[in-house]
A protein has these predicted regions:
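A short, exposed helix-loop element centered on a Lys and neighboring polar residues
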Residues: 127-128, 173
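Substrate-binding pocket helix/loop in short-chain dehydrogenase/reductase
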Residues: 103-104, 108-116, 199, 210
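Catalytic loop of short-chain dehydrogenase/reductase
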Residues: 145-167, 172-181
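Alpha-helical segment proximal to the catalytic Tyr-Lys
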Residues: 132, 177-181, 238
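Short C-terminal tail/terminal secondary-structure segment
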Residues: 2-5, 241-313
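C-terminal substrate-recognition "lid" of short-chain dehydrogenase/reductases
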Residues: 218-247, 252
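Short, small/polar-rich loop/turn modules that mediate ligand/substrate recognition or access, typified
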Residues: 93, 180, 185, 240-242
Length: 313
């Protein structure tokens, strides 16, 4: 057997929650390119169906399943539907997650409860239903990959999100210890700030500071996670469990944003923020390249960065 064959997922059956867009979509496409048949699970039926169709266009079997991960009955029905079409479940990527921004001294309990329900409880409900299926099938085995965050390790000034993701990391370790006897590997991946629609409205000054704090030199993109997902889904990680794999370009090696973010003058105008949002949503294309802001694509925002950080020609 070639060592490269350890990463081959042909014949494996996978599901990805939150698989319609962003990180989840990238994970679903990466698994499919490695050979796995993939169920795209999401509340967004239109985007989820589009991602599933994109996978099928590559000659790989795919399905879309709608599911609210906070509802145990829906989660159980989702796993049953995946198995009804695929026959078994080998790989599960639990990616569904949300963030609600706001000052922690002002956030209401409803917002807190919603974030914890999706990010932590939803991850547990999915992992539980997935493990039950993996235990029932023959051979008894499986790979469960939870998507956590660097915010589980460093304070990110968003208590509900940070706490929920820290919970995901420890949940992963606990389930790994419990389910190893069933030959189920449970691991998690902790990305940095990733350029996805969920983060489209993050202020430009904050984004540029994130880039500066990332030793590998660019704000993280969904494709930066693909290798880690394939590794943890494949036979290459058969003796790896309980791991929190930090995939952040080295960001957590540096200080986080709290003092800098609050001390940088707000020199990006509302008009420039509007232009940024349109770019980030794909109307005019992402305004970033490997070096950060691309002045050829977005000259007015590049000028705003220069002003905010005192850059001189």
């Amino acid at each position: 057997m070639s060592d490269l064959s350890l990463f081959d997922l042909k014949g494996r059956k996978a599901l990805v929650t939150g698989g319609a867009v962003g990180i989840g979509r990238g994970c679903a496409l990466a698994l499919a390119r490695a050979g796995a048949e993939v169920a795209v699970v999401d509340r967004d039926a239109e985007a989820g169906a589009q991602t599933a169709e994109e996978i099928r266009s590559q000659g790989v079997a795919a399905q879309f399943v709608t599911c609210d991960v906070t509802d145990k009955r829906q989660v159980q029905a989702m796993v049953e539907q995946v198995v009804a079409e695929f026959g078994r479940l080998d790989i599960a990527v639990n990616n569904a997650g949300i963030a609600i921004l706001g000052a922690d001294e002002e956030i209401d309990q409803a917002a807190w409860d919603q974030v914890v329900a999706v990010n932590l409880t939803g991850t547990f409900l999915c992992a539980q239903a997935e493990a039950q299926q993996m235990i029932r099938q023959t051979p008894t085995e499986g790979k469960i990959i939870n998507i956590a965050s660097m915010s589980a390790t460093i304070a990110n000034c968003n208590a509900s999100y940070d706490a929920s993701k820290a919970g995901v990391v420890h949940l992963t370790k606990t389930l790994a210890a419990e389910w190893g006897r069933f030959n189920i590997n449970v691991n998690c991946i902790s990305p940095s700030y990733v350029l996805t629609p969920m983060h489209a409205s993050t202020p430009l000054v904050v984004r540029e500071r994130i880039r500066q704090l990332t030793p590998l030199g660019h704000v993280q993109r969904p494709e930066d996670l693909h290798g880690a997902v394939i590794f943890l889904a494949s036979a290459a990680s058969d003796f790896v469990t309980g791991l929190d794999l930090m995939v952040d370009g080295g960001h957590t090696l540096n200080a986080w944003l709290t003092p800098l973010t609050r001390s940088v003058p707000p020199r990006v105008t509302p008009e420039q923020e509007t232009v940024q949002l349109k770019h980030d949503l794909g109307v005019l294309g992402w305004p970033f390249d490997a070096e950060g802001i691309n002045p050829d694509v977005h000259p007015e925002i590049a000028d705003a960065f220069k002003a905010a950080f005192g850059v001189k020609e």
